[in-house]
Curated annotation (Swiss-Prot):
Name of the gene encoding the protein in the UniProt record: cobB
EC number: 6.3.5.9
Keyword Phosphoprotein: no
Name of the featured protein: Hydrogenobyrinate a,c-diamide synthase
GO terms for MF: ATP binding; cobyrinic acid a,c-diamide synthase activity; hydrogenobyrinic acid a,c-diamide synthase (glutamine-hydrolysing) activity
Family designation: Belongs to the CobB/CbiA family.
NCBIfam families from the UniProt entry: PRK01077.1 (NF002204)
Biased composition (Pro residues): 254-272
Pathway: Cofactor biosynthesis; adenosylcobalamin biosynthesis; cob(II)yrinate a,c-diamide from precorrin-2 (aerobic route): step 9/10
Amino acid sequence: MTSSDSGSAVPRLVIAAPSSGSGKTTVATGLMAALTARGLAVSPHKVGPDYIDPGYHALATGRVGRNLDAYLCGPELVGPLFLHGARGCDIAVVEGVMGLYDGAAGEGELASTAQVAKLLRAPVVLVVDASSQSRSVAALVHGFVSWDPEVRIGGVILNKVASDRHEALLREAVDSVGVPVLGVLRRAAPVETPSRHLGLVPVAERGSDAVDAVAAMGARVADGCDLEALVGLARSTGALSCAAWDAGEALVSSPPPPLPVPSPGAAPPDPLVRPGRPRPQAPDGLRRRVAMASGAAFTFSYAEHTELLAAAGAEVVTFDPLRDEELPEGTQGLVIGGGFPEVYASELSANEGLRKSVAELAFSGAPVAAECAGLLYLCRELDGLPMCGVLDAAARMSKRLTLGYRDAVAVSDSALAVAGTRMRGHEFHRTVVEPGAGAAPAWGMRAPERRVEGFVERGVHASYLHTHWAAEPGVARRFVERCRTS
């Protein structure tokens, strides 16, 4: 099979389930691996904001795992972002989130797998945990098929099937609903995918064990599923009417904020540093070097952030805070995303050279964007261990899980946004920072409750809030312009 002539018509499937824990991650990742092993170029996608599953998807396919989140980015960007990721691919596999019809709390279908399937005009394959039922599976499947006629459930994969007789009973029941059974996975020891306080352990921390786990998922799906039928179902989709997202075009189309009004007698503003203007070539012909944290402690990042920074004129280089003793030479801006600094607090604290390098850059006024784990790293201490000391705040682990979507507005002008900029984000952590906000907070939260959060100091913007810059491309442009002027 060759790549689709029209990217908008790429064959595609959505792997969903009635609820979490049904096996959709195993099936989705295994299907990606099985199709890749057959020589297909597979585009991997994940519904929702989760950073960890896309790492397994990337391992299965050899391509960047990408998120499709209608809450963070808006429904209008789901199709374009999907097509951007699927360029040049033979087929796309989209792993759902939670149950098929579960979305943002109190928002109807918003951010649900069902909504994304409809936006992509993609058939859904329902993964059903059949371990404790037989004929009742027909009622369950019938309910999911009939709940929303706009959602096309094209087949079922039965998981945790006990025996040949159990399989026969299940097939007979599902046949009565008129939905084909596209796979049967027998009850077996689960593939080794260890979890901890925030879900699966990321790929970056598991090394060869993650490779083995993905291979096992692929073998299980290849043995138990009708791959030809699944590919045929994926090919039954039509073209999408939207165009693929492009980072450069997004920057051009994103409206710039107004120029500041100069004070009397002040020199006119330099047009090269107009906030929000599509990036002109810098006078010295150089791109601005932005260092981005990576490695086992900082694995949470959306690929579009790097693409937007590059389109805005940055040279993005990665570094590992666990191993590198200083920031990359010539660093002019710093991005520290999410991850698990609490797991690696001792190692991060022991790397005094890098902590000093980060602090020096931050205190120089250079732009620093830190989300969640990045916020913790910039604090004075984490669980009593010294961190970078950029923020006069202390972080500690907590038993309480903070989780959910947030509506936010920028409270203070910063390296990322002008005050009043509205964005949507999500929080996902088991830590506490005290105080929770600085004299100049980063965000004012409007939902689910009103509060201020985060820190804006010098060029630093640090917050628990994870955002998706594709929803507000001017964030990347403003950050790179700040690199140019700091």
